[in-house]
A protein has these predicted regions:
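Cys/His-rich short segments
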Residues: 379-463, 479
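Catalytic/regulatory signature loops of cyclic-dinucleotide turnover enzymes
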Residues: 334-345, 370-385, 601-605, 627-659
């Protein structure tokens, strides 16, 4: 129970800041928070409320003589300091007399200081937003406007918190619901209102990392038989703790993701794409939760999960390492049994100290470098000699293959489909209808450790939960609050129609083709490791940055697509990359929206590169993915000047690897030409259409040594002056000389958009 009280107390340790900002009370936030929580009978627990009342040095000094030396508030105190990257001697409390706190200051953007050496520092902030279950968080982008948060905003939060906290208890079954409340209500509440500092860390991010650190310290002390928390964490010799490797930074890294999603064929390949992507997302979420369960930790200890990766903060104990070793063995056995070598999850960890997490020794970046090296080593030596021998003896010659994924094992009797593909096809029908997913002893999709997953209605899930305590429930993009109820998972899963044939049937004009977009954030790894200046690098800030990226791809993406009902299905949206299929015109149009909104969201501190392919509906999915991936790679290699040494990226490739353009060229050159062409060519008959094809042929033949084609071009344009006007004919001629490549692209898009179906 001590650990539960510590986690809940650490999560709620700064709740008094909301009370302070939303009322006229003049007391310190620690006192206000303690009084507020004690107004709920179920939270009247001294160990818990002390973590709220006494997490600053001044308050601790005044009561330590009357408190036990193993009081939990000492752990919350130091975890609070580590989370904020703050030296314990600079321990200021919001609401204290003599300091100039600005109650109305808005949450700043973490992108303000990102890559500031190259792109400068900004002063953007967020408008106030609180997300509830029934109201989806609106698109909330940082603005240069000096936003202010009024007392009324905070008063509204207090009302919402009272309603939710009445339904919660400080126990294991309610911790995740408490976290979800905090994420919904506190994501845009600044942790600090000190305008002399950066105010870009939300109260939610600071509080959850504080709880993660606190629970890890608790486990470390239990293993080391340390019982005098006052001496270890508060008295003068407490500085020694900051150098102890009390923590483990641990990660999961899934390999084979793209091949698993895309390397399928068969009549139902397109329909099962989303199911395969969703399955991998859920695998990583469930694996992370299962490990936390074994370690007796909460989801606060998940620093990031998404895109085939997860990062967790754990205690550096022999018990933790033993659990990790057993877990890794069991996990690998399951993946080998179900997927052979097609999918693999690497697990690695590295020991870290509080000073590492605070970057006081300049070693914070080294945590991720060491972790990356250990993960790479695991991937390079993923199987033992015995496992490889077993794999080599499992194959059978002339075996029937699965009609979808071409596997020759796990086939269902009397059917040419394997168990996994069959299950994915069954669940794919429910993915767009249901938002609740249950992991239990019985179900449809195989999950690790003897469990199965099913998509159910709310009433079905609720009934199952009441009858079986072992059931684990996840909700997709919906928050639920209650006892051991549901874990919210945000997913970029916008679906216009599950049937692509029906989707294309709705397009009345233009070539009947699917468009495929693959996009990736440029240099994201570099930004994560080196983008935040040393003075501001901390575990809370990197957690904030990671969550911001997830919010864009897993939450805002859905809203951007739904605003104009784009005929597009999101197949995969990770923490930094994207794969979508839809009507090709909608894919092309939305690509500009994606680029613009991502630039707005990151304040032009980050960019995105993309490849856009066009294919017939029956074209093999694996080839669609591969060829569009090649187009994306071409965009990543974009150089505005051939003499440039380094690629600038921030580009898009259209249909063919030779058609690589900067986003600015596509938006402000090609699309401008396309609009002019559409306006002037819209009344052309079939003879006029032939003129366009002739024009493209001539343009493709023009180069520095072919003046004859320039003459032919001028002659062809002169013959069309009567139909398109002399002015536009001259403009086409000028474009042909100055911007031939973009003119060809604009003409080709026009033909594709107006071609008979």
């Amino acid at each position: 129970m001590d650990k539960i009280n510590l986690v809940c107390g650490s999560l709620l340790h700064d709740i008094g800041k909301i009370i302070y900002r939303g009322t006229s009370e003049r007391a310190k936030h620690s006192k206000l928070g303690g009084d507020f929580i004690k107004s709920f009978e179920q939270f009247r627990n001294t160990e818990l409320t002390d973590c709220i009342r006494y997490h600053h040095a001044q308050e601790i000094t005044s009561v330590k003589s009357n408190k036990e030396k193993n009081s939990l508030f000492y752990i919350t105190y130091i975890a609070d300091n580590i989370s904020s990257g703050m030296d314990r001697r600079k321990d200021l409390e919001e609401g204290a007399e003599g300091f100039n706190w600005d109650k109305k200051v808005a949450l700043g953007s973490v992108f303000n200081v990102l890559n500031e050496k190259e792109k400068g520092r900004q002063n953007y902030s967020y408008p106030f937003v609180a997300r509830t279950r029934i109201k989806e968080e609106p698109l909330n982008f940082p603005t240069a406007t000096q936003n202010q948060y009024t007392t009324a905003y905070y008063d509204g939060l207090i009302t919402d918190m009272k309603t939710i906290l009445q339904r919660l208890k400080p126990d294991k079954e309610h911790i995740n619901s408490l976290l979800q409340m905090m994420e919904s209500l506190w994501s845009y509440v600044p942790s600090s209102t000190d305008k002399n500092q950066l105010v870009d860390i939300s109260l939610y991010d600071h509080s959850r990392t504080t709880a993660a650190i606190a629970s890890a310290i608790y486990d470390y002390f239990q293993a080391e038989n340390i019982t005098d928390y006052q001496k270890e964490l508060f008295d003068y010799n407490a500085t020694e703790f900051y150098d102890k490797n009390a923590f483990l930074m641990m990660n999961f890294d899934m390999s084979g993701v793209q091949n698993f999603i895309y390397n399928i064929s068969g009549s139902k390949a397109l329909k099962s794409l989303r199911a395969r992507s969703f399955y991998l997302d859920m695998l990583l979420e469930y694996i992370s939760d299962n490990l936390l369960e074994k370690l007796e930790l909460s989801r606060a200890n998940i620093l990031y999960v998404g895109g085939g990766h997860a990062y967790l903060l754990l205690a550096n104990t022999n018990k933790t390492k033993a659990i990790l070793s057993d877990f890794e063995h069991d996990l690998k056995t399951w993946f080998l049994d179900k997927f052979k070598i097609d999918l693999y999850v690497a697990m690695a960890y590295t020991e870290v100290s509080a000073n590492d997490l605070m970057n006081h020794n300049g070693h914070y970046r080294d945590i991720y470098r060491r972790l990356s090296q250990k993960t790479s080593a695991k991937k390079a030596n993923r199987y033992t000699a015995e496992e490889i021998l077993n794999l080599n003896h499992q194959g059978t010659e002339n075996a029937r293959e699965c009609r979808e994924c071409k596997r020759s094992d796990l086939l269902i009797e009397e059917d040419d489909i394997c168990e996994i593909c069959d299950s994915l096809q069954k669940v794919s029908r429910d993915l767009t209808r249901e938002n609740i997913f249950v992991i239990a002893n019985e179900g449809v999709l195989d999950m690790p450790f003897g469990k199965k997953m099913s998509a159910l209605s709310y009433s079905q899930a609720d009934k199952l939960k009441k009858s079986n305590a072992e059931v684990q429930i996840y909700t997709k993009n919906i928050s639920e609050i209650g006892q051991n109820l549901m874990t919210r998972i945000d997913m970029g899963d916008y679906t216009y129609r599950s049937d692509f044939h029906e989707m294309l049937e709705e397009v009345e004009v233009g070539i009947n083709r699917l468009g495929v977009l693959r996009a990736d954030v440029d240099n994201l790894g570099q930004a994560f490791i080196n983008g935040i200046p040393d003075d501001y690098l901390s575990i809370s800030r990197t957690a904030t940055f990671s969550r911001a990226m997830s919010r864009f791809f897993k939450n805002y993406l859905n809203q951007l697509l739904s605003e104009k009902s784009y005929k597009i299905n999101v197949i995969y949206a990770g923490g930094d990359d994207l794969f979508m299929i839809g009507a090709w015109q909608d894919i092309l149009d939305f690509s500009i929206v994606l680029k613009q909104k991502f630039a707005d969201f990151t304040q032009n501190k980050l960019s995105i590169s993309a490849g856009i392919g066009m294919f017939r509906e029956k074209y093999p999915v694996a080839r669609m993915a591969s060829l569009t991936g090649d187009l994306e790679d071409a965009a990543k290699d974009y150089k505005p000047d051939e003499r440039a040494v380094q690629a600038t990226k921030n580009a898009v490739t259209l249909f063919d690897a030779t058609n690589v353009f900067s986003w600015d060229t596509l938006e402000n050159d090609i699309f401008v030409k396309l609009d002019a062409i559409t306006k002037n060519f819209e009344k052309l008959d079939e003879t006029g259409k032939a003129f366009i094809y002739r024009l493209i042929d001539l343009l493709r033949g023009v180069n520095e040594n072919q003046q004859i084609n320039i003459a032919r071009l001028a002659y062809t344009l002169s013959r069309m002056e009567e139909k398109i006007g002399k002015t536009f004919a001259q403009e086409l001629y000028n474009w042909a000389n100055a911007d031939r490549k973009t003119l060809i692209m604009a003409l080709e898009i026009y033909i594709l958009k107006t071609r008979e179906r």
